Amino acid sequence: VLHELSSRSRFFFSLTEKDNLVIDAHCHSSSILVRTDAARAFRLMADGERQGRWALGSWRRRQVADTTFVGESVFSGLPTWVRLHVDPARLAVDYDVAATESGLRFRNAARVLDGSALGHPPGTALVTLFTWRLADQSDDAWAQICSTHETEMFLIRALLESGRDGGEGDEDRTPS
């Protein structure tokens, strides 16, 4: 049964079964299974410049400091700043995001899992993006980030599976 969460969240519905909330109104996740190893998938997710190939909110990134990058939103044309906190041991990345460098704060996270750990064939990886809704985020802005992350999953998979991710054997780092 679908139920509207609140007037503030009128575009987002919760799926309930026996009065248990199934869809989280505060966090959105998008995942996709890719035919590449987890290490390669993680390298793409953890490389701030190469993310400019798939991150629609921060396209065509350039590095401005050790872990800080700036790109351009395909939606507004305005700059989007991103700072990465990379944890290679856990194949995890936290992303601070803002319109200005001084405004950077935690917004998104990525995890990469070896597909075989979840029963998928060897040589596969599960890539997941998470985002959390800000207290003052409009319905439109929330809908945009959620649907954007879902679209980005297909870009990530296409880049990794085609070898156009900027990894080994793909020296062209220019986003197309």
Feature map (PLM): residue ranges:
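Hydrophobic-ligand-binding modules of eukaryotic lipid transfer/binding families
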Residues: 7-33, 113-122, 146-151, 162-176
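Glycine-rich portal/gate segments that line the openings of hydrophobic small-molecule binding cavities
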Residues: 50-107, 120, 151, 162-163
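Generic structural detector for well-ordered beta-strands
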Residues: 31-35, 83-85, 111
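Hydrophobic ligand-binding cavity/cleft-lining segments
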Residues: 9-65
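Beta-strand/loop substructures that line and gate deep hydrophobic ligand-binding cavities in soluble
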Residues: 98-162, 167-169
